[in-house]
Amino acid sequence: MKNILITGGVRSGKSHFAQELARDSGELVLFVATAAAGDDEMRQRIEEHRRSRPAAWRTLEVTTHVGDRIPQRIGRAKIVIIDCITLLVSNCFGQYADANEERIDVALVEQEVTREIGELVECISRLEAGFVIVTNEVGAGLVPPNQMGRLYRDLLGKANQLLAQQVDEVYLMVAGLPLRVKPSQYPGK
């Protein structure tokens, strides 16, 4: 299977499409969940996602160091779903923000996100598995009103661009419909 990046807005059908692609492959799947259950609502979302996955799929729940942990847990899986980069980048922020999330060490966060995505890119190139990576498109919204929000948007945008360069296909989800972005349907793009 190819390496695929699926991006789009919140609740646009990204995870469902990723699972559909993996299911249709008929291969063994390792599902990598990056969410941390910080409150009841998030715990409920995580549980909904767990129930939506086939029982035969292996699950790795990891909030950071994803690229290091996948090779340890891949086993015989031929497909790896990572859901999602959005939360992975957010988890990197959590390590360096103060308790009120008002101050952040920008250099350390940038370094951590760069390291995290670099390890993931290396993992993708090293393993003989197809990767289906889910992320959010946050660049189409309003400019965040604070420094942390703008930094998050910028770093997630850079992470998405790096991953898009590494994969064979990129899809943008709109209202549950996948739009192929890469390879482009336009010559030379």
Regions found by a protein language model. Give the residues of each.
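Catalytic phosphate/metal-binding cores of nucleic-acid and nucleotide-processing enzymes, i.e., regions
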Residues: 1, 75-76, 111, 118
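Conserved P-loop
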Residues: 2-74
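Structural motif
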Residues: 5, 81, 132-134
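Residue-level signal for inorganic ion chemistry
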Residues: 18, 49, 81, 136, ...
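Short, well-ordered beta-strand core segments
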Residues: 29, 80, 169-172
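A basic- and aromatic-enriched beta-loop-alpha substructure that forms the phosphate/nucleotide-
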Residues: 73, 78-96
